[in-house]
Amino acid sequence: MAQVPASGKLLVDPRYSTNDQEESILQDIITRFPNVVLMKQTAQLRAMMTIIRDKETPKEEFVFYADRLIRLLIEEALNELPFEKKEVTTPLDVSYHGVSFYSKICGVSIVRAGESMESGLRAVCRGCRIGKILIQRDETTAEPKLIYEKLPADIRDRWVMLLDPMCATAGSVCKAIEVLLRLGVKEERIIFVNILAAPQGIERVFKEYPKVRMVTAAVDICLNSRYYIVPGIGDFGDRYFGTM
């Protein structure tokens, strides 16, 4: 059995894979890219992934379970932030030695699909500032092109949760990271949070930006000829916002 940190037995849907195939992919990713944090593969997580992968799932149900999953992802990503020791006094006048967040954080969503993750971040980080980056493919060069950015003025002093539910070719996320670095954000302070990734996308992210951290719920097998993740979810933004 592949030993994946912080995970239990890897449950595999036999419709698209075998245990050995999926575990081999996950083991390879974890071994080669130590900055990838894979969520613990519990039955609850796999059940939610099954619902949002199902093409027959109606929009309302898709959004409900996607939101649940996103919140769990954000909670997992918060573990990657630095903490400092803090002592408080309980209502029983007894000291408790705990911790508190050490640094300011903000979210940055890659428009449009990344906006689906904003409410999950706000739900667990009250008052968290959120910026946006819009990236589209240049029809002439086929390369990602920055169209729009609206980010906190002090973003260089913050840890950044970069939000995009899918990591296929990683063109958009790499462009977004480029923008953040240009604005003074430290590479090691960027945490890329996504639901589903392809091995090709992960490899590109860490080839270009090895100090970034990535938190994901699942890693799939590959990309198809249209650069969709397989077995995948489909177009997450279209399904979430009902624009299919």
From Swiss-Prot:
Indicate the impact reported for K59A: GTP-induced enzymatic activation is reduced 4-fold
What is known about what this protein does? Catalyzes the conversion of uracil and 5-phospho-alpha-D-ribose 1-diphosphate (PRPP) to UMP and diphosphate.
Q: Name one Pfam family in it.
A: UPRTase
UniProt record similarity statement: Belongs to the UPRTase family.
The cofactor note from the UniProt entry for this protein is: Binds 1 Mg(2+) ion per subunit. The magnesium is bound as Mg-PRPP.
Q: Its annotated pathway?
A: Pyrimidine metabolism; UMP biosynthesis via salvage pathway; UMP from uracil: step 1/1
Q: Which residues participate in GTP binding? A: K59, R68, Y102, S103, K104, I105, R129, R158
Which cofactor is recorded for it? Mg(2+)
The name this protein goes by in its record: Uracil phosphoribosyltransferase
Q: Which reactions is this enzyme annotated as catalysing?
A: UMP + diphosphate = 5-phospho-alpha-D-ribose 1-diphosphate + uracil
| Entry-linked SUPFAM superfamilies | PRTase-like (SSF53271)
Query: Where does the chain bind uracil?
Result: I229, G234, D235, F236
Task: Give the consequence of mutating K150A.
Answer: GTP-induced enzymatic activation is reduced 4-fold
Species for this entry: Toxoplasma gondii
> How is this chain's activity regulated?
Allosterically activated by GTP. Binding of GTP leads to 5-time activation of the enzyme.
Fetch the InterPro entries from UniProt. Answer: PRibTrfase_dom, PRTase-like
Gene Ontology molecular functions: GTP binding; uracil phosphoribosyltransferase activity
**Keyword terms, alphabetized:** Allosteric enzyme, Glycosyltransferase, GTP-binding, Nucleotide-binding, Transferase
Supply the EC number(s).
2.4.2.9
Annotated consequence of substituting D235 to A/N: No enzymatic activity
The record's subunit annotation is: Monomer. Forms homodimers in presence of substrates and homotetramers in the presence of GTP.
Q: Where does 5-phospho-alpha-D-ribose 1-diphosphate bind?
A: R112, R137, D164, P165, M166, C167, A168, T169, A170, G171, S172, D235
Residue pairs linked by disulfide bridges in the UniProt entry: none
Q: Set out the biological process GO terms recorded for this chain's protein.
A: UMP salvage
